[in-house]
Swiss-Prot record:
It comes from Clostridium botulinum (strain Kyoto / Type A2). This is Cysteine--tRNA ligase. Keywords: Aminoacyl-tRNA synthetase, ATP-binding, Cytoplasm, Ligase, Metal-binding, Nucleotide-binding, Protein biosynthesis, Zinc. Monomer. It is an enzyme of class 6 (ligase). Its cofactor is Zn(2+). GO terms for biological process: cysteinyl-tRNA aminoacylation. Zn(2+) binds at C27, C207, H232, E236. A motif ('KMSKS' region) lies at residues 264-268. InterPro entries: Cys-tRNA-ligase, Cys-tRNA-synt_Ia_DALR, Cys-tRNA/MSH_ligase, CysS_C, Rossmann-like_a/b/a_fold, tRNA-synt_1_cat_dom, tRNAsynth_Ia_anticodon-bd. HAMAP family: Cys_tRNA_synth. It is found in: Cytoplasm. The gene is cysS. It catalyses: tRNA(Cys) + L-cysteine + ATP = L-cysteinyl-tRNA(Cys) + AMP + diphosphate. A motif ('HIGH' region) lies at residues 29-39.
Amino acid sequence: MKVYNTLTNKKEEFLTLVPGEVKMYVCGPTVYNFFHIGNARTFVVFDTIRRYLEYRGYKVKFIQNFTDIDDKMIKRANEEGSTVKELGDRFIKEYYKDADDLNIERATKNPRATEFMEEIIKFVSDLIEKGYAYEIDGDVYFSTKKFNSYGKLSGQNLEELQLGARINVDERKKDPMDFAIWKSQKPGEPAWESPWGMGRPGWHIECSCMAYNLLGETIDIHAGGSDLSFPHHENEIAQSEARTGKQFAKYWLHSAFVNVNNQKMSKSLNNFFTAREILEKYDADVLRMFMLSGHYRTQINFSMELLDSTKSALDRLYNSINNLENLLDEVKNEELRDEELEYKNELQKYKEKYIEKMDDDFNTADAISVIFDLIRDVNTNVTIESSKELVKYTLDLIRELGSPLGILQESTKASLEEEIEKLIEERQKARKEKNWALADKIRDNLKERGIVLEDTPQGVRWKQI
């Protein structure tokens, strides 16, 4: 298995610190709002990578944190007239609802930064003691010049960074690139007692501390969105390695942005969507498959038209699954016949190809293509003449390959029939109202999904083709 390591900018053989075990830390949300589709891609990508590692036999300890104390949270809480804790509690609950709806598996642990104040204060104290940090007026800063390899993750040169950092710099800092690891209390802010007075941690130290306390000095995978590479992950490396003298993370994985209608997502452009808004209109399978239809290191473009295309493609997969489920009830032969054995063995090539694609830096786009190839093969070769054993095997194989992607696990019969009957009712209503355009549109949309309608004297019947 090979993974692309941002630290070295190349694909590397994936070799864990302890054979068969993976320690993985993913930067989670700041819990002051619902998470948007850009966040959703990050969560889906690393949920999929975690699932695939488990599919390949690894025991994964998966930590994803909640940032529940930070400038954005303080601002939002003050605007609402609530406390930061109340805000955090509310949006952690909302995160779980949306993540569950998106079929994201629960982490081994979701630590909250505020649960680790004693450990964070100890971390800051150790950095001061080792000469990597200094205190000024209750604020504590990390000295980037003391950490010789600062910039190694993002590939940035410290001298160039210093030139760019001289605008609006805090004159008290020894160097413009030094960053806060402890902030003194300002009026109206929550604070904790520390050797430097009342204050709160900087954002970067929170993740370093939680990773250290829950996973140890060195971890296998540290991951997050590509926007976190600098300064967040760069600063995490500096703090952690300064404290322990050991490599912080062996592999760094970063997922790319989601653009909306070929533009960067932003509230000012009115192209900002929360995952919840999309999940009200589309099933989780649709959003997951869309997010995984491009390589995780490549930016993807989001639009409702592209989601509709993904839905149509997914419907074709589910139609095939539905046909196989129906065949299970209809086929007469129970046991695998001799002439089917060779075909069953041939189907293994799809599993091998799928693993080959996913082992190559988790290439979900190509893995999904393999599933479509499998479905096309099965549609042609598994029929009413096949044995029940072969039909069941093909169904199980499709679901097995869908499982690491978090798709194709539902039984389709009831939900598909219900949806089609509802659309037929809408079409009948449109026809009564002489809205022929809508009636034809519903019929054509169903036909695209492999559903043909037959108008009979007894009513409308439908069948899959």
